[in-house]
Amino acid sequence: MKLKTFFVLLLALIAIQRVNAQAKSYILHTVAFYNFENLFDTINDSNIDEEWLPDGAQNWTSKKYNQKLENLARVLSEIGTGSIQDKKNPNSPTLIGGAEIENRGVLEDLVKQPKLASSDYGIVHFDSPDKRGIDVALLYQKKHFKVTSAINIPLIIYKKQMDASAKKKNEADDASDDKSEVELNSERVYTRDQLLVTGFLDGEEINVIVNHWPSRSGGEKKSSPFREAAGALNRKIIDSLVKINPNAKVITMGDLNDGSYNRSVKVALGAKLKKTELKESGDIYNPFEQMAKDGNASLFYRDAGDIFDQIMISQQFTLPDYNSFRYWKAGIYNMPYMIQTVGQYKGYPLRHSINEVGFSDHFPVYIYLIKQIN
């Protein structure tokens, strides 16, 4: 009889523990990155925008511009959920990194779109010296994220870096050397700055770096030193943040114009495939490396799918407890309406053409951050 009573009590205790486990609640925030692909207005200004004017090569009219804004807003509004338990209540991302942005004005037009207006986004944007006249930026929901500092950090690179790389193309690749030849008196290549924003996400300090690394113009191998320099600058920024605060939480995201396997990411930045490889606070985990290995793609480069758009996180986001914001999972947002369905580019992102205003030649990427609240 006593034994029977013991088993009844044991089963009751197990049931209570299960109920408590099921009752756990979490705060969830989505962090996204989207290359908007040529988000230009129709106003002729001092920037390099002649192609994107009503009488330009793209015949970029106000009607097309407004349709582009509507398309982007639709995508952004659908990424993310209000909570893990309530996936039927979508909420646009708390933080959005963006690239290929002409100026602050186009961002102001974007966040005013009906599908985004209720999220009340703030904007962090600086003009960069990029030769195409495009910048990076961060959009943030004001009710959740409070900016404390923002700075644009220039990437100083020179044409001689590319030339030196071409001369060495037949030499053995030394993975321990992530430096390129630089001649300071050679011609500077003007590209996008790296944007560093620090703020409090629901009271918890995080640092966000938004990137758009140099393109593969001139060839992947020949231009690689430029992106390796971008990766090294990213590494320097992260190291400086961790030096100030050993427990710093860092998110670095952007269109890197390289895959997770390239030297710029693996060597210069030092991103890791597995969370178990993270040994120090400044070590970086790249969840998109495994996704690429699994055959996923955020774009197609020379007819091959790849993930150039990546969001990476520092070790502090990967700790096993959920008493503060931790990384949960990552994804690529590629709904059917965003995909080309016919023709030579079937399966590719549905981008802009002369006859159709699409979305972008990239799919947006995102991660979820979660924190236990009971």
Give the ranges of each region predicted by the language model.
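Bacterial Sec-dependent N-terminal signal peptides
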Residues: M1-Y26
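Active-site-proximal beta-strand elements of phosphoester/diester hydrolases
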Residues: T30-N38, S149-A150, E205-S215
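Active-site metal-binding loops of divalent metal-dependent hydrolases
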Residues: F36, I101, W213, D255-L256
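Structured beta-strand-rich core segments of catalytic domains in phosphoester-bond hydrolases
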Residues: I101-E205, W213
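Metal-dependent phosphoester-hydrolase catalytic domains
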Residues: A21-Q22, E228, S240-V250, D258-N374
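N-terminal, active-site-proximal structural segment of metallo-dependent hydrolase catalytic domains
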Residues: A21-Q113, D120, V124-L138, D173-A175, ...
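Active-site His/acidic residue clusters
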Residues: N47-E50, A57, E204-F226
